[in-house]
Every structure is written in structure tokens, then in C-alpha cells.
Amino acid sequence: MSKRTEQLTELLAPVVEDLGFVLWGVEYIQGRGAVLRVFIDHADGISVDDCAAVSHEVSGVLDVEDPIPGEFNLEVSSPGMDRPMFDITQYVDYIGEDVQLKLLAPVSGKRKMTAAIVAVDGDTLVVELDGETLRVPYSQVDRARLQPRFN
């Protein structure tokens, strides 16, 4: 997680939580057409009205605190079924599910893989790929997203 993303998460988490939601994660894409994506979650799901309410409150905080120079678009949404993963603690609730991983360095010769989440062991993600158990240091995970199974 970049320093800016960490700062935005720290700034926005209390705002989102005060509205009764969980801040699932924050993505900031710099450059022309910059975008700040705020993912919110709730045990009962997320509605469009929920996103609008959070967007309104988050916009106010961003206007006052001004943590991002220049113009950007704010997007507030549910993380969805194929949710991006932002923190190693988020994997615990999805043990047994598949996750797409993009790694900074290869593990067992692979930088990209879709594997089943087996466990979280401290700062290590344990996954199973083709019958082989792999230990992936979380510091090596560049991006991760749940891969829903449709049976």
C-alpha cells in the first residue's frame, strides 16, 4: 500500500465507520483523469443510497483536508463478489475461496496465479495451487482479487 493510500485510509475510515459501514479499501490512480475509489462494505450489503451517503460525507472531508492535489473523480462502491483484497486480515473470512494473485516476485516460478486460500499465518498467505501448498509472503502481493466460483 502506498503512503498516500495509507493516509487516505486513515483519513476516511472514521468517516465511513461513523456512517455504519466498513471501509474495505481505498485505491488512488494518479495522473490525468485521476480517480479515488473508496470501497465500503456492510453485513447487509451495500445499496446505491449507501454509496451516495458515503460519497457526500467523504467529499466534505476531502474538500476540507485536501489530501490530493489537483482534480480527481471520487467513486464509492461495494467491493463486489470479485472484491479486491487490501489487507492480509481480509483473507481470513475467505478461506477455501479462490483468489487471483499478482506478485512482485515469483513464488514457485509464478508471478500470476489463481489459487485457493488455505490459511493466513502471520504475514504469510498460504494458498493451494494444483495440489501444491504455497507460502506467499504478503509483502510480495502486488494485487489480489477474489475469484468467485459459479457452479
From Swiss-Prot:
<dbReference type="InterPro" id="IPR028998">
    <property type="entry name" value="RimP_C"/>
</dbReference>
<keyword id="KW-0690">Ribosome biogenesis</keyword>
<protein>
    <recommendedName>
        <fullName>Ribosome maturation factor RimP</fullName>
    </recommendedName>
</protein>
<comment type="similarity">
    <text>Belongs to the RimP family.</text>
</comment>
<dbReference type="GO" id="GO:0000028">
    <property type="term" value="P:ribosomal small subunit assembly"/>
</dbReference>
<dbReference type="InterPro" id="IPR028989">
    <property type="entry name" value="RimP_N"/>
</dbReference>
<dbReference type="GO" id="GO:0006412">
    <property type="term" value="P:translation"/>
</dbReference>
<dbReference type="InterPro" id="IPR035956">
    <property type="entry name" value="RimP_N_sf"/>
</dbReference>
<dbReference type="GO" id="GO:0005829">
    <property type="term" value="C:cytosol"/>
</dbReference>
<dbReference type="InterPro" id="IPR003728">
    <property type="entry name" value="Ribosome_maturation_RimP"/>
</dbReference>
<dbReference type="Pfam" id="PF17384">
    <property type="entry name" value="DUF150_C"/>
</dbReference>
<dbReference type="Pfam" id="PF02576">
    <property type="entry name" value="RimP_N"/>
</dbReference>
<comment type="function">
    <text>Required for maturation of 30S ribosomal subunits.</text>
</comment>
<dbReference type="InterPro" id="IPR036847">
    <property type="entry name" value="RimP_C_sf"/>
</dbReference>
<keyword id="KW-0963">Cytoplasm</keyword>
